[in-house]
Amino acid sequence: MQYQEVAGGICAPKGFAAAGVHCGIRANHAEKYDLALIKADVRCAAAGVYTTNKVCGAPIKVDRAHLKDGYAQAIIVNSGNANTCAANGVALAEECCELVGKELGIDPQDVLPASTGVIGQPMVIDPFARGIPAAAAKLAADEQGSADAATAIMTTDTHKKEYAIQFELGGKVCTVGAIGKGSGMIAPNMATMLAFYTTDAAVSPILLEKALKTVVPGTYNQMSVDLDTSTNDTLIIMASGLAGNPEICEENADYHAFVAALTAIAEHMCAEHAGDGEGATHLITCEVTHAPDLKTARAVSRSVVCSNLFKAAVFGRDANWGRILCAIGYTPGDFSIDKVCVRLSSKAGEVYVCENAAYHPYSEEEAAKVLAEHDILVKVDMGTGDASAKAWGCDLTYDYVKINGDYRT
């Protein structure tokens, strides 16, 4: 299937506008945008997936309640305070939805809140009461609207994350756009981040949720920065249906094409998140091939990108492939490592470092050149089957400790 990258992020699909403003949630950041608003022209099919952490943010509880009917029309997101472990958290999130509903003239039940920031801090409605009218007045269905919203949800991110692609369904051009944040507290099992997707494809709520839950295990659940599962991780998608394609109401060819498009944009966003890990200097992608089954392929690739020893080796540009084999070896499951081969690759070239679970002669000098690049691909061929999977992570640096040591200051 062919995809065309387009500008505009979440505003690229038909029927969506967005804005980002400063409302004062972060008292020590006088100018930083900290409130994002996303609005659809029509009531949309919608779906969400959330953190697996038992301690979850108040907005997630509200989202689950508001999405029971499978529809939404707006998303309100703040950065700087997680609204987690706060006595009034749910009531405050509901009040935010009321404010958005009033400003936009929509049902508050069709508003989905999200928060990111420091856990366990008091939170008041005043900044939202100021910021929501300002955001509503600033809504724009263009590149700037998406960019402002993407900026407003950032915390320790070093740059905004947005992407959009076009593809064809039922003879109609459809678009999917995304913004996301997250560079720390990122670990497999929907941990890490906030991500908001919009599409103008016509998809029923049931099939939209199924598509999202089909895509997440092989993308967002395959990403890790630090093995910390956040309390607020949220991925929400809204589908306006304004592209005019026949509505996807069954698992037909159009459904599978839609899932493929969602997978493509999710993989891109995962690489963006992992490559911008706190203090990171390298994006690490592990691609496992010829595994005995999908479960093993996913588990092995996750083990490699989660290995602190290997992450530290990449930071030091050290082709210590033994740490890769070690990570593969402690991966749960019943599989053979006897035929495992490993290559390290980047735009500077490729080195073959391990063959049949043993040393393969290579140049340390060439390996260091490969590992000097930002994007590193670890190719693991298990030689025992046909399954494959990817996982995304980053190196472990001194700055990761610095950033998290200073997080609340």
Could you tell me what each predicted segment is?
Residues 1-91, 95, 101-409:
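A structural signal for small-residue-enriched, beta-sheet-centric alpha/beta enzyme cores
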